[in-house]
């Protein structure tokens, strides 16, 4: 089995019911040849699924709790995401790690809950700028992989997103050799346990750099923030992946 190609959009805390019109354009304009996923704020999940109708577009959550249900005000269980129509959930995004103090162990527990609910967990890893400058990128990422991936992970229920923290929302990206180096290390580290796992790159992916990034070995897709909010920005990225 070859890794599946996935173009994933992360709307973060952006969008409202009016923004769902973008979904019509994505469903109408998307090419086959890769999976396409949009992860909106949780309140938009169900209306987005309704809007997609029979269209070939996946939706996902941006986080879930590690428990199945209970007294956790403001949190969302993985089964509730699945019930709303989600197929995937992003876990351990650097914004969750920074804003909410999520540790690798938290991410692993959430991923276990996601798998129990039948969701595909997109587990995010990535170094800060200080870590890159200190030359510790590969060690940092190896440790995040080791700590954030639960034993129940398989190539089918897990996706790994390499997202250098300093490239997110900044317009800066690593050079191709830097992306290739990290993706090769991740592929190698997971070769025994998750041999066909999809490896996404994330951080300032846009139409102008997508083709170049998708040509890099072991890049099976992208996790896209800002450029996923508008169909006109996102569709060229989807096309570039489908053509890669
Ligand atoms: P960006 O965000 O594409 O806006 O840099 C990527 C991400 O955080 O997943």
Protein language model annotation of sequence segments:
Residues 1-244:
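Active-site loop-to-helix "anion-binding N-cap" substructures in soluble metabolic enzymes
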């Amino acid at each position: 089995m070859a890794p599946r190609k996935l173009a994933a959009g992360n709307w973060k805390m952006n969008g409202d019911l009016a923004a769902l019109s973008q979904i019509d354009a994505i469903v109408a304009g998307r090419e086959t040849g890769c999976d396409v996923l949009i992860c909106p704020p949780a309140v938009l999940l169900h209306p987005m699924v309704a809007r997609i109708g029979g269209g070939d577009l996946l939706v996902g959550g941006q986080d879930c709790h590690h428990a199945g249900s209970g007294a956790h005000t403001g949190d969302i269980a993985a089964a509730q995401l699945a019930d709303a129509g989600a197929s995937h959930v992003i876990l351990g995004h650097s914004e969750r790690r920074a804003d909410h103090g999520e540790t690798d162990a938290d991410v692993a527990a959430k991923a276990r809950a996601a798998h129990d609910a039948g969701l595909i967990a997109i587990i995010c890893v990535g170094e800060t700028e200080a870590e890159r400058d200190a030359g510790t990128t590969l060690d940092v990422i190896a440790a995040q992989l080791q700590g954030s991936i639960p034993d129940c992970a398989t190539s089918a229920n897990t996706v790994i997103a390499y997202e250098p923290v300093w490239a997110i929302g900044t317009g800066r990206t690593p050079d191709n050799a830097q992306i290739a180096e990290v993706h090769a290390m991740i592929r190698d580290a997971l070769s025994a346990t998750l041999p066909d796992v999809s490896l996404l790159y994330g951080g300032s992916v846009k139409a102008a750099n997508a083709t170049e990034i998708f040509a890099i070995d072991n890049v099976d897709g992208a996790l896209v923030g800002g450029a996923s909010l508008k169909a006109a920005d996102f569709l060229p990225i989807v096309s570039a992946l489908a053509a890669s």
